Amino acid sequence: MNERTFVLKGTICYSNSLTELSITENGYLVCEDGRCAGVFDELPEKFAGISCTDFGDELIIPGLTDLHLHAPQYTFRASGMDLELLDWLNTYTFPQEARYENTEFAKEAYSVFAEDMKKSPNTRACIFGTLHVPATEILMEQLDKTGIKAMVGKVNMDRNGSPQLQEESAQASADATVQWIKDTLDKFENVKPILTPRFTPSCSDELMEKLSEIQKRYHLPMQSHLSENFGEIAWVKELCPNTHFYGEAYSQFDLFGGDCPTIMAHCVHSSDEEIALMKKQGVYIAHCPQSNTNLASGISPARRYLDEGLHIGLGSDIAGGTSVSILRAMADAIQVSKLYWRLVDLSMKPLTVEEAFYMGTEGGGSFFGKVGNFKEGYEFDAVVLNDSTIPTPLKLSPKDRLERLIYLSDDRNITAKYVAGRKIL
């Protein structure tokens, strides 16, 4: 029998919509050739002969997607949390990322990162590497072995780095990127390349033009940063005086959605014009609440993005953020939305559990296609959660149990994990 065809039994939770959970207690979740074939109160006769794993009353949720994190920064999580973004980059990030020129260091660091990602509730991720091609290929190889599905980027930066962390020229950066794409495009089953200009201050116009040509040639998605910090936004205005807002620094090179699937991390201080263009172009926003708090960047208006119909998912933004768990990001998103409502705009209601859960599952997962839900035809990404380590004498509803896991869980609560129908944990 096909090993990617099976049934899971338990308390099944997934999003019916942005604002509504579907919960089936003692339900059957069918995986057929790696895709969801339905959720049932009683197992249909046509699936009767399929192997079934009974998880009792444990919760079964869709796999989570981390839309934005920096793998090389995992080594120095929780360091420099008293600094703002630009000082933090120069003090911690750039010196540490320069170490990945050493492939032995890269192997050691990325093996720890990959193992912790495997133990997390995340099944998909969009990840920044460094500008070093050998180290980035090591990262891709390590992640591929875990079974997690990921997009990994070789970072481009030809200006405003450091002597140890900056490419020689736009041409050198582009040439290295093309060779890396050729080497990795079909090399790994689970991990694919994604174009990754670090952010506008790190990339000259010449480099952006070349990356645009590469994107059109290989039809790759793209990830970068947008409107995270006031100092960063002012710097972009100095570097790109002819742009009306930060996003135009990307869109002028056709690297802002449309025919170029795009993730922009943060979007904390996006202008009305920038938001309108993101919506028009279908840009995905990676909301990174923990990082935006740690680096004092501000509070992204996630409520506005949801209400106006923009694509938005969640990101851990390691190492601005400290936890790889997107369950933690859900809790953080709810908490900071309450501060935004109370301190900034009383018309922007706080996020609900249902909305944060959607953002962490289908909201971000849809960047990978039909991912992040148990509706028929979706890729079968699932996480089984056991909340027995969080005891209570209370009789809790499945939604209450899910909310407690969002706020209180760690990797000890993960019983099993499936990606595209394959059990990886």
Language model region names:
Residues 1-47, 59:
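N-terminal metal-binding scaffold of metallo-dependent hydrolase/deaminase domains
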Residues 11, 252-258, 303-391:
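His/Asp/Glu-enriched, well-ordered alpha-helical/loop segment
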Residues 14-17, 379-425:
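C-terminal cap of metal-dependent C-N hydrolases
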